[in-house]
């Protein structure tokens, strides 16, 4: 459940940053990660222009001894998109950030929202796989349950 600032849950292991249109996906990803004992928070960003929510992100970042691990979920192009804005904001304020941008970097053929998400690698199981590839220590047992990264392989094979 989101609090008044658009935050959901603890963020010991990382924070998923999303816009309203990707909140359901973020919640699914968080649920899959939670099954393995990882605590990822969700921060919903209300708008990009004007971007007035950096103070909230800075406060999250300052609670971490290490660089803040963030995943951005974006349905638009990666270059110049939501993740780029987040990276620029952190760099501009000299705050450490370890960022994984999950988004589209190619033309997506027509299909249902679910088909397009799978094609673009934005289905929840695919995002979890990207997280585990980016931060392999998560898959190497640094959790109460451990995991097998293969269980998050796409049901359609490599997409």
Predicted regions and their residues:
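Thiamine diphosphate
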Residues: 1-159
């Amino acid at each position: 459940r989101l609090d008044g600032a658009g935050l959901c849950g603890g963020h010991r292991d990382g924070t998923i940053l999303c816009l309203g249109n990707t909140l359901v996906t973020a919640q699914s990803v968080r649920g899959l990660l939670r099954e393995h004992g990882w605590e990822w928070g969700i921060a919903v960003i209300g708008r990009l222009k004007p971007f007035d929510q950096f103070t909230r992100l800075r406060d999250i970042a300052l609670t971490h001894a290490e660089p803040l691990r963030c995943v951005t979920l974006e349905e638009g192009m990666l270059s110049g998109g939501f993740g780029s804005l987040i990276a620029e904001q952190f760099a501009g304020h000299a705050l450490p950030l370890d960022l994984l941008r999950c988004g589209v970097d190619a033309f997506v053929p027509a299909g249902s929202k679910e088909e397009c998400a799978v094609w673009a690698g934005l289905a929840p199981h695919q995002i979890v796989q990207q997280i585990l590839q980016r931060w392999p220590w998560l898959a190497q047992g640094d959790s109460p349950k451990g995991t097998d990264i293969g269980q998050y392989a796409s049901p359609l094979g490599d997409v």
